[in-house]
C-alpha cells in the first residue's frame, strides 16, 4: 500500500458521511487487458483483480459503506476458454478458503447471488460454508454475483411466481414490486445506490437490471487491477455531486 493509500484509510475530509452511498456495486472489468499490457498471462490479471476487490471491501468497511456487491462471474463467462474458466472456479474456491477466517473476524457477512447450482460441487460447498459461518455477522454485507445474469434472474423470478399462481398460493392481483423482489437472487438486499464500472466500457453487461432502475452509474477508464482507494475516492466525489431524483422532477 502506498503512502497515499495509507492516508486514505480514514474517510477523506471532502466526503460527507451522510451523502455516502449505502450500497456500492462494481463491474470489475479489465483484468485480461491489464495482464496483456504487463506481458502476463490473463490469469495473473484475475489474481491481481482479487487483491483489488479485497482492498475495496476493506475500504468500504473503513469508510462506513454498508454493502458491496461484486460481479465476479456472469452467465456469459462460461463462453471463455475452458482453461480460464477452470482457473476462475479454482481461484474462487481458494480465496474463499483462505479468506474466510479473516472475513469472520472482520464481521463481514458474505452472500452469493446467481444460479449457484451450475457451479462445481466443491465450490458450492465452500460457498455454503462461507455464508453459514458469516450469516450472523452485522458488519458490511458483501454479495458476490457468481454465475449471475440479470435477464435470467428476472425469468426465474417470473417462473417462480407463475408456479405459485398456478398452485393457488398467490393471486395475480397480489403481484407487485415487493412480491417480485422476494423472488430475485438478491432478495433481502437493498438496491445499489452507485454502480462503478472499470475499463471505460459503458454498458451494464446483464448486471442487476432490475435493481439498477434508479442507481447512479460511474465509469472509469482505470482497469480493475489498478482500481484503488484513490480511484474509489474519485467515484464517491462524483456521486456526491449528483442529485438523485428517483424519477421525480
From Swiss-Prot:
Which positions does UniProt annotate for substrate binding? 30-34, 42, 46, 74-76, 78, 80, 197, 203-205
Q: What is its EC number?
A: 2.5.1.-
Tell me the keywords, alphabetical order.
Magnesium, Metal-binding, Transferase
Q: Which InterPro entries match?
A: UPP_synth-like, UPP_synth-like_CS, UPP_synth-like_sf
Keyword match Ribonucleoprotein:
no
The first-level EC class reads transferase
Cofactor annotation comment: Binds 2 magnesium ions per subunit.
Signal sequence interval, chain numbering: none
As one GO molecular function, the record gives: ditrans,polycis-polyprenyl diphosphate synthase [(2E,6E)-farnesyl diphosphate specific] activity
* Family annotation (CDD domains): Cis_IPPS
Q: Name one GO biological process term.
A: polyprenol biosynthetic process
The UniProt function text for this chain reads: Catalyzes the condensation of isopentenyl diphosphate (IPP) with allylic pyrophosphates generating different type of terpenoids.
PANTHER family, from UniProt? DEHYDRODOLICHYL DIPHOSPHATE SYNTHASE 2 (PTHR10291:SF0), DEHYDRODOLICHYL DIPHOSPHATE SYNTHASE FAMILY MEMBER (PTHR10291)
Subunit structure, interactors included: Homodimer.
What is stated as this protein's family in its record? Belongs to the UPP synthase family.
Query: What is the protein's given name?
Result: Isoprenyl transferase 1
Amino acid at each position: 500500500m502506498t503512502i497515499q493509500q495509507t492516508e486514505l484509510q480514514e474517510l477523506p475530509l471532502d466526503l460527507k458521511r451522510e451523502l455516502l452511498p449505502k450500497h456500492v456495486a462494481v463491474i470489475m472489468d479489465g483484468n485480461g487487458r491489464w495482464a496483456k499490457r504487463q506481458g502476463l498471462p490473463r490469469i495473473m490479471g484475475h489474481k491481481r483483480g482479487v487483491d483489488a476487490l479485497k482492498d475495496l471491501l476493506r475500504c468500504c468497511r473503513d469508510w462506513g459503506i454498508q454493502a458491496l456487491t461484486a460481479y465476479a462471474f456472469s452467465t456469459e463467462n462460461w463462453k471463455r476458454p475452458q482453461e480460464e474458466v477452470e482457473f476462475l472456479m479454482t481461484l474462487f474456491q481458494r480465496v474463499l478458503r483462505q479468506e474466510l477466517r479473516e472475513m469472520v473476524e472482520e464481521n463481514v457477512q458474505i452472500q452469493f447471488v446467481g444460479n449457484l447450482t451450475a457451479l462445481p460441487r466443491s465450490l458450492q460447498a465452500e460457498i455454503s460454508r462461507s455464508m453459514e459461518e458469516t450469516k450472523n455477522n452485522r458488519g458490511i454485507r458483501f454479495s458476490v454475483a457468481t454465475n449471475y445474469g440479470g435477464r435470467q434472474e428476472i425469468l426465474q423470478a417470473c417462473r417462480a411466481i407463475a408456479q405459485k399462481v398456478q398452485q393457488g398460493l398467490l393471486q395475480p392481483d397480489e403481484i407487485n414490486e415487493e412480491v417480485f423482489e422476494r423472488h430475485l437472487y438478491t432478495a433481502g438486499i437493498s438496491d445499489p445506490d452507485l454502480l462503478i464500472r472499470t475499463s471505460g466500457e459503458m454498458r451494464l453487461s446483464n448486471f442487476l437490471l432490475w435493481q439498477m432502475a434508479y442507481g447512479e452509474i460511474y465509469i472509469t477508464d482505470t482497469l480493475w487491477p489498478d482500481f484503488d482507494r484513490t480511484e474509489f475516492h474519485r467515484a464517491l466525489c462524483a456521486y456526491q455531486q449528483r442529485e438523485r431524483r428517483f424519477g421525480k422532477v
